Amino acid sequence: MSWQEKINAALDARRAADALRRRYPVAQGAGRWLVADDRQYLNFSSNDYLGLSHHPQIIRAWKQGAEQFGIGSGGSGHVSGYSVVHQALEEELAEWLGYSRALLFISGFAANQAVIAAMMAKEDRIVADRLSHASLLEAASLSPSQLRRFTHNDVAHLARLLASPCPGQQLVVTEGVFSMDGDSAPLAEIQQVTQQHNGWLMVDDAHGTGVIGEQGRGSCWLQKVKPELLVVTFGKGFGVSGAAVLCSSTVADYLLQFARHLIYSTSMPPAQAQALRASLAVIRRDEGDARREKLVSLIARFRAGVQDLPFTLADSCSAIQPLIVGDNSRALQLAEKLRQQGCWVTAIRPPTVPAGTARLRLTLTAAHEMQDIDRLLEVLHGNG
């Protein structure tokens, strides 16, 4: 089989399964509204959970940062790309979340890959929730360590896997809020079992940070858990992009030496770090509380109105509200019907989710209004 035949076969298989991914160029897509092909849609596919991507204070901070520092960082943080504003953001994140140190990364994917690649050796073991994000599972699969997966949120299964002999160290990996189901991990129970077996815990709280807990401190703070490694991202609750790893001073020093994604990547623009500082300020103050409270009300309105639809509603109290349809083709058709009626919704299919669980991944944001939720419910009931 030639290279082209190999590529064609893979694409043909995706097409046959109604699983071929496509991108749609949009003129506007992060907030309440999405604009595509000169048409405006109510946007129920954005991860901008607090509606901060268009916040004037954050936009102004980015502009001021660009005027002061330029539009790029100019290099890796180990060379010349680590500015005083990067340092200030790291210090503010560490203080906010109760850690000694924070290290900035260009994306959550890069942060997860960097930590696992740097920390794990051949004699070690990763025990990961089966539904962990692709960045975590791919990094675990590529690492020299042994990978074992436990049934989703099944602490008893996790305990059995941890109890089997391991010549090295054990790292338990999970998410705070799961990206495709919207449910939360039982972090306190997971941490207890992990500590009983002398392991470390790594939590990716991409979808909880900024959105839940006191001052938006996320899933771990809400459940009174402090993992050894906490990954937070800035493309969801913060409304920007990028990520950070929260850890001890010693672990931070170690990652600065051995995390290749950190060492060999151009750091985020200082202007972006300036915008993230402004976003963090909004998240922590009363305005952040008001946005979180509004989001909770919108979620409650949606869940109350969707109960009698002929779809499986995930057990989620988060901004992620999946309607599990099952069949790939049916999920695509339903998403298209909703778009025709002015609601932009994305169909998520395998391999992103398990086979037979194709779904509409609906996301609500504080930028929405109650009438937006009512319109979504009206359209769903008309196509249920």
From Swiss-Prot:
Q: Where does substrate bind?
A: 21, 133, 352
Superkingdom per UniProt: Bacteria
Q: Name one GO biological process term.
A: biotin biosynthetic process
Stored InterPro entries: Aminotrans_II_pyridoxalP_BS, Aminotransferase_I/II_large, AON_synthase_class-II, AONS_Archaea/Proteobacteria, AONS_Proteobacteria, PyrdxlP-dep_Trfase, PyrdxlP-dep_Trfase_major, PyrdxlP-dep_Trfase_small
Instruction: Specify the signal sequence span.
Output: none
- E.C. numbers: 2.3.1.47
- So what does this thing catalyse? 6-carboxyhexanoyl-[ACP] + L-alanine + H(+) = (8S)-8-amino-7-oxononanoate + holo-[ACP] + CO2
User: Which residues are listed for pyridoxal 5'-phosphate binding in this entry?
Assistant: 108-109, 179, 207, 233
Molecular function terms from GO? 8-amino-7-oxononanoate synthase activity; pyridoxal phosphate binding
List residues modified as N6-(pyridoxal phosphate)lysine: 236
The coenzyme or cofactor needed here is:
pyridoxal 5'-phosphate
Keywords on record = Biotin biosynthesis, Pyridoxal phosphate, Transferase
Q: Which PROSITE patterns match?
A: AA_TRANSFER_CLASS_2
Q: In which pathway does it act?
A: Cofactor biosynthesis; biotin biosynthesis
Q: How does it assemble?
A: Homodimer.
Protein function: Catalyzes the decarboxylative condensation of pimeloyl-[acyl-carrier protein] and L-alanine to produce 8-amino-7-oxononanoate (AON), [acyl-carrier protein], and carbon dioxide.
Q: Which family does the similarity line name?
A: Belongs to the class-II pyridoxal-phosphate-dependent aminotransferase family. BioF subfamily.
What's this protein's name? 8-amino-7-oxononanoate synthase
Q: Which gene encodes it?
A: bioF
